[in-house]
């Protein structure tokens, strides 16, 4: 299993279903996951249940149905200074 320590990936819909399980799998391989979600409170509760380390996740609000939300997400992600690896 290839490890990716410190690399950053964005997962949309990361508060439930496939997105949440992708977050768990990616963090297990060393990725830092930007969890792009509509409801950050729901995402925090969900990820806490999976015991994903805080240093390997960043929860950010994103509603893909809203162009303004997408713009805000991009601006906020850029402000983190993180490089996007995948």
Q: Where on the chain are the PLM-derived regions?
A:
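A glycine-rich helix->loop->beta "capping" turn
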Residues: 5, 52-55, 76-86
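Canonical Rossmann dinucleotide-binding motif of NAD(H)/NADP(H)-dependent dehydrogenases/reductases
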Residues: 2-34
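Conserved Rossmann-like nucleotide-binding pocket used by diverse enzymes
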Residues: 10, 58-60
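Conserved glycine-rich Rossmann-like NAD(P)H-binding loop of the short-chain dehydrogenase/reductase
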Residues: 29-45
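Short, well-ordered alpha-helices that flank and scaffold nucleotide-derived cofactor binding pockets
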Residues: 24, 28, 48, 75
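Generic leucine side-chain signal with a strong bias for well-ordered alpha-helical environments
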Residues: 20, 26, 50, 62-64, ...
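The beta1-alpha1 cofactor-binding region of Rossmann-like NAD(H)/NADP(H)-dependent oxidoreductases
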Residues: 40, 60-75
């Amino acid at each position: 299993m290839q490890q990716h320590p410190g690399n950053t990936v964005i997962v949309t819909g990361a508060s439930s279903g496939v997105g949440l399980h992708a977050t768990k799998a990616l963090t297990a391989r060393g990725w830092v996951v930007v969890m792009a979600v509509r409801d950050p409170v729901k995402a925090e509760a969900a990820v806490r249940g999976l015991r994903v380390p805080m240093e390997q996740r960043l929860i950010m609000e994103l509603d893909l149905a809203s162009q303004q939300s997408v713009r805000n997400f991009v601006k906020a992600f850029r402000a983190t200074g993180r490089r996007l690896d995948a």
